[in-house]
């Protein structure tokens, strides 16, 4: 078991004791259990219930949203963390936070906001996660109205940071993937105190691969139920070869490795049973058996491979690495390819994405025109504190990113109606 230190438990703002207890009571929870509770009770996490995973949150009778996906990632991350001797609450908290920075419409919304935000430092869902946890989520403020967000511990913010680097490097080069906006560099510097490199801590690594497992396994399950995904492709060698080519281009690896992964999956009785899904009670039981066994297959393999690669047996923060065996990575990549590409290649899905981006641009123009008064009340203080046009633009981006999809659509409709009225 890794020994976390007082530095790992430190928070950016020293909080006073809670004054409202009826009787004296010593809180037995550790700092990471408190971090987990803060994330679990946050508005930012609840808003994920109305944000797109692969298909929209209102599609189907059993919708999988960013929130349900995050709960699944948290459970898987807790399992990997427990197997490696990490703090289970810390790993679960990292899973809960991993998508908390996603804007309306998921990656499609992220692309639209990145285009809009070019003059104020860009937009990246992972960087927005750090910004929410350390500033935007209303929990802790000082006497000067400086917000510390949820005021999580150093280790918790580190565990939530998949890419612990700013957008711009010291030499001026720009990272495509980053976990911190340049303007928030002082926060990342505090989080990474004592860790000079830009590699993710082991808890964040566990969270990251848990995301891949949940994404691939559970989204395949959704696709099968909706009729968008058919596992029969694993036995159609012509279509499989084409799918492997697409998957390698989109997610990495080689087509040959993905075809080999299909060979391994075909050998599993649970895959054959799920391929015959017909919507019956037995069909759903077989499908749930597939998801359960695949998750266990991948979690167990990762734990054993990680242990084998670390003779000391100690994991935590910068000690140890999460190791993903090649076969596991290939199987997960193939399943992710099946889950995503069949949906993404649907013409109606692409048309829907075009409309989503149009709404985001419309809401942005509406907030720019309306200024302070058009913003949600919580964001007006940051607007007043802004010292440049770029900082005011960042406030607008923060406001849009915080919206649920339903809310964004209502604001877009109001904007369209106002434009029509104004002629």
From Swiss-Prot:
GO molecular function: dGTPase activity
Gene3D superfamilies xrefs: Hypothetical protein af1432
Domain of life of the source: Bacteria
Family statement drawn from the similarity comment of this UniProt entry: Belongs to the dGTPase family. Type 2 subfamily.
Pfam family, one: HD
Keyword field: Hydrolase
Keyword Hydrolase: yes
CDD domains the UniProt entry points to: HDc (cd00077)
N-terminal signal peptide: none
Name of this chain's protein: Deoxyguanosinetriphosphate triphosphohydrolase-like protein
Domain HD: 66-216
UniProt GO BP: dGTP catabolic process
Phylogenetic classification of the source organism: Bacteria, Bacillati, Actinomycetota, Actinomycetes, Mycobacteriales
């Amino acid at each position: 078991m890794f020994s976390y230190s007082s530095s790992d438990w430190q928070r950016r703002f020293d909080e006073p004791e809670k004054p409202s207890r009826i009787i004296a009571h010593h809180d037995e929870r550790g700092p990471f259990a408190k971090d987990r509770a803060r994330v679990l009770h946050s508005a930012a996490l609840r808003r994920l219930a109305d944000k797109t995973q692969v298909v929209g949150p209102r599609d189907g009778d059993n919708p999988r949203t960013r929130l349900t996906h995050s709960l699944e990632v948290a459970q898987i991350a807790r399992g990997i963390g427990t197997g490696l001797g990490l703090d289970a609450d810390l790993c679960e908290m990292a899973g809960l936070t991993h998508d908390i920075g996603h804007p309306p419409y998921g990656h499609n919304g992220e692309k639209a906001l990145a285009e809009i935000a070019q003059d104020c430092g860009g937009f990246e869902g992972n960087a927005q996660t750090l910004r929410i946890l350390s500033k935007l989520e209303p929990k802790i403020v000082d006497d000067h109205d400086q917000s510390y967000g949820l005021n999580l511990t150093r280790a918790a913010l580190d565990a939530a940071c998949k890419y612990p680097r700013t957008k711009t490097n010291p030499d001026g080069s720009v990272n495509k993937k980053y976990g911190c906006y340049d303007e928030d560099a002082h926060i990342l510097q505090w989080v990474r105190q004592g860790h000079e490199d830009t590699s993710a801590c082991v808890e964040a690594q566990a969270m990251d691969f848990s995301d891949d497992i949940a994404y691939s396994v559970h989204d395949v399950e959704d696709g099968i139920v909706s009729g968008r995904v058919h596992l029969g492709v694993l036995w159609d060698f012509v279509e499989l070869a084409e799918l492997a080519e697409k998957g390698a281009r989109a997610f990495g690896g080689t087509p040959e490795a993905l075809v080999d992964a299909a060979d391994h999956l075909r050998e599993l009785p649970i895959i054959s049973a799920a391929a015959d899904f017909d919507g019956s009670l037995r069909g759903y039981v077989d499908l749930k058996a597939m998801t359960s066994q695949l998750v266990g297959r991948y979690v167990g393999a990762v734990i054993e491979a990680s242990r084998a690669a670390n003779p000391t047996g100690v994991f935590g923060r910068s000690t140890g690495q999460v190791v993903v065996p090649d076969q596991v990575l290939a199987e997960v990549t193939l399943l992710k390819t099946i889950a995503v590409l069949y949906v993404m290649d649907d013409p109606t899905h692409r048309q829907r994405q075009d409309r989503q981006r149009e709404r985001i641009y419309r809401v942005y123009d509406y907030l720019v025109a309306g200024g302070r008064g058009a913003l949600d009340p919580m964001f007006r203080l940051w607007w007043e504190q802004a010292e440049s046009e770029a900082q005011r633009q960042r406030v607008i981006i923060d406001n849009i990113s915080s919206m649920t999809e339903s809310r964004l659509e209502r604001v877009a409709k109001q904007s369209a109606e106002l434009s029509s009225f104004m002629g």
